From Swiss-Prot:
This is Spindle assembly abnormal protein 6 homolog. Residues 191-201, 214-226 have a biased composition (Basic and acidic residues). It comes from Danio rerio (Zebrafish). InterPro entries: SAS-6_N, SAS-6_N_sf, SAS6_CC. GO terms for biological process: centriole replication; centrosome duplication; embryonic cleavage; mitotic spindle organization; nuclear division; positive regulation of centriole replication; positive regulation of G1/S transition of mitotic cell cycle; positive regulation of mitotic spindle organization. The lineage of its organism: Eukaryota, Metazoa, Chordata, Craniata, Vertebrata. GO terms for cellular component: centriole; centrosome; cytoplasm; deuterosome; procentriole replication complex. Central scaffolding component of the centrioles ensuring their 9-fold symmetry. Required for centrosome biogenesis and duplication: required both for mother-centriole-dependent centriole duplication and deuterosome-dependent centriole amplification in multiciliated cells. Residues 202-213 have a biased composition (Polar residues).
Length: 627
């Protein structure tokens, strides 16, 4: 039995005797032959093949005895059991490094002959470092004989046949699956087509029934819309007047607030300018004081340096004076000694004079000694006089230095006082500057808050103006829709009921007829819809059709007139489109502005009809209620 451990393609550097080096891709396979009986041992088989050249075959069988000799020859440190895994690890490193320009691990196949015919070749695993090419392992492979090549080709052929059989079996299975799926899809398609035919027939029947039912519902809804139209108009007029008055009051209040805020802002700006000017003055004073302080500090430093130099000179003079005083003391001691010696010599002289008669021979020598001593005494007295003169000069210099030091101290003391006063003034100015800066920051915060309030009020005012503009646009659009609906209803009634009585009734349309206007506007500040009013803001004017004129307070006066000829469209009789307002304008929304008293009155009017409206409908003929 054999166990395949490694089978991969690697780039190999091929070397021969008389040819250049080249790189080729060679398949390296490592197999472990397991023994059939416990007596035999395991063998490791290394095989080199080329997928493009089927006759390229090199084999190497390594037994445990061969590995021991290989271990001794190449200095290996592993056993036979761990050798295959280490060999595979080296090959994996060669695979990782083979795509690089300068691979660290390289697989070499070298032959001693000029071509790879039937001579053995060496397979080397070489590591390239900065010092040398290090060969980790070198295996001597033998070329395969004819029988080996035939066995290898036979094994390749058998493996190819097995793969072919497996692929054929997979192909049969896939064909069977696809045919089964195709049959199932065809069956489902036929079933779905039958269901589709049934659904089409049902749909045609349902559409016919729904169209007839829809026509009946449309006629009923038209009648209800005409009833609610006249009822809602009066409520909308009242609501519009209330909303306009509230808008007028709110705009006046906002304008007064804006004027107050502007005056406060101007006062704050004036205060800010004044504080800025005071800050500039204080800063200028501060800079001047700082400059004076710097100058005084520099003067103090220079005076301190001069004082230190004078102190050092004074110390040197005192040291010299002490040295001279010690020398004078020594000389005085010597003079005293000499005086004592002179006294002694006088005594000796007296004794000698007394002994003159007895010692005449030694008189000359004694006189010589006396003359010598007198000369030494004279020299000592002269030196003493010179030392006294030097001491007097040093004392005079010391007095002059002490006077200079006193003058310097008298100059530096007032300068230090001035410096202390300037530093105190500077500290006071800094404290005042900090206080003014704090007051300025408070004023700036107050100004920022007032600016924010002003911006908020201006923003609210702009938004209210935008809402008023949108309300105006909605009113104009609704009036256009109502005009178009009325014209289409007129055309339908004229086409369906064209009789003399109907003509008389269509001629007697009231001119002061009003139209319902409802709207829900989603905005950040919900404001009521400004609808059409009577008087200067009347909804309806002369006979050509309903016209709307809306003049809010915050917008420039503009008249939005809508003529029925410009926006009239022919009624779609085939589809029977509903005429009047869309149902979305009658729906209740959570974010809408509630119309005061509208919904309860609508509910009551649905339950109990008003006698005034019915009487008016019966008394006055109208184009909306023919016949």
């Amino acid at each position: 039995m054999t166990e395949l451990l490694f089978n991969k393609r690697l780039q190999v550097l091929v070397k021969s005797k008389d040819t250049d080096e080249r790189r080729s891709v060679i398949r390296v396979s490592i197999e472990l032959q397991l023994p059939s009986s416990p007596v035999h041992r395991k063998d490791l088989v290394v095989r080199l093949t080329d997928d493009t050249d089927l006759y390229f075959l090199y084999n190497l069988i390594i037994s445990e005895e061969d590995f021991q000799s290989l271990k001794v020859q190449q200095g290996l440190l592993i056993d036979f059991t761990s050798f295959p895994q280490k060999f595979i690890d080296l090959l994996e490193q060669c695979i990782c490094e083979q795509d690089k320009e300068s691979p660290r691990f390289l697989l070499q196949l070298s032959s001693s002959s000029s071509a790879f015919d039937h001579s053995p070749s060496n397979l080397n695993i070489v590591e390239t470092n900065a010092f040398k090419h290090l060969t980790h392992l070198s295996l001597k492979l033998l070329p395969g004989s004819d029988t080996d090549i035939k066995k290898y080709l036979a094994s390749c052929l058998s493996s190819v046949k097995e793969e072919k059989q497996q692929l054929q079996q997979k192909l049969r299975k896939t064909e069977e699956d696809l045919t089964r799926q195709l049959n199932y899809a065809q069956q489902t398609l036929s079933e779905k087509s039958r269901e589709l035919d049934k659904l089409r027939s049902e749909w045609t029947s349902q559409t016919t029934s729904l169209s007839s039912r829809h026509m009946q519902d449309l006629t009923a809804e038209r009648e209800k819309a005409l009833e609610t139209q006249s009822r809602l108009q009066q409520q909308n007029e009242q609501l519009r007047q209330e909303l306009e008055s509230s808008h007028h009051r709110s705009t006046q209040q906002l304008q007064t607030k804006v004027s107050e805020l502007e005056t406060a802002n101007r006062e704050l700006i004036d205060k800010k300018y004044k504080s800025d000017s005071t800050i500039r003055d204080l800063k200028a004073k501060l800079t001047s004081l700082e400059e004076e302080c710097q100058r005084s500090k520099q003067q103090v430093l220079s005076l301190r340096r001069e004082n230190s130099a004078l102190d050092s000179e004074c110390h040197e003079k005192e040291r010299l004076l002490n040295q001279l005083q010690t020398r004078v003391a020594v000389l005085e001691q010597e003079i005293k000694d000499k005086d004592q010696l002179v006294l002694r010599t006088k005594e000796v002289l007296e004794a000698t004079q007394q002994q003159k008669n007895s010692v005449e021979g030694n008189a000359e020598s004694k006189q010589l000694q006396i003359s010598k001593l007198e000369s030494t005494v004279k020299s000592l007295s002269e030196e003493l006089i010179k030392a006294n003169g030097i001491i007097k000069k040093l004392q005079a210099d010391l007095k002059a230095l002490l006077g200079k030091i006193k003058v310097k101290n008298s100059v530096t003391v007032p300068q230090e006082k001035i410096l202390q006063e300037t530093s105190d003034k500077l500290q006071r100015q800094q404290r005042e500057l900090q206080d003014t800066q704090q007051r300025l920051s408070l004023k700036e915060e107050e100004a920022a808050k007032l600016k924010e309030q002003l911006e908020a009020t201006v923003q609210k005012l702009d938004e209210s103006r935008e809402v008023l503009k949108t309300n105006e646009n909605v009113i104009t659009w609704l009036n256009k829709q109502l005009n178009e609906n009325q014209l289409s209803r007129k055309q339908e009634t004229v086409a369906m009921f064209e009789t003399p009585a109907a003509a008389l009734r269509s001629a007697a349309v009231p001119h002061n007829m009003a139209f319902p206007i409802t709207s829900t506007i989603n905005s950040k500040y919900p404001l009521a819809l400004s609808c059409v009013s009577s008087g200067s803001r009347s909804v309806l004017t002369s006979s050509n059709g309903p016209k709307v004129q809306f003049n809010p307070m915050s917008v420039k006066p503009s008249a939005a007139e809508v003529s029925p000829a410009a926006f009239s469209q022919p009624a779609n009789k085939e589809n029977s489109e509903p005429v009047g307002l869309d149902s979305k304008y009658f729906e209740r929304r959570d974010d809408s502005i509630p119309l005061r008293g509208l919904l309860p009155s609508m509910h009551l009017n649905r339950e109990v009809p008003k006698p005034l409206n019915t009487a008016a409908a019966k008394a006055t003929p109208s184009a909306f209620f023919p016949g």
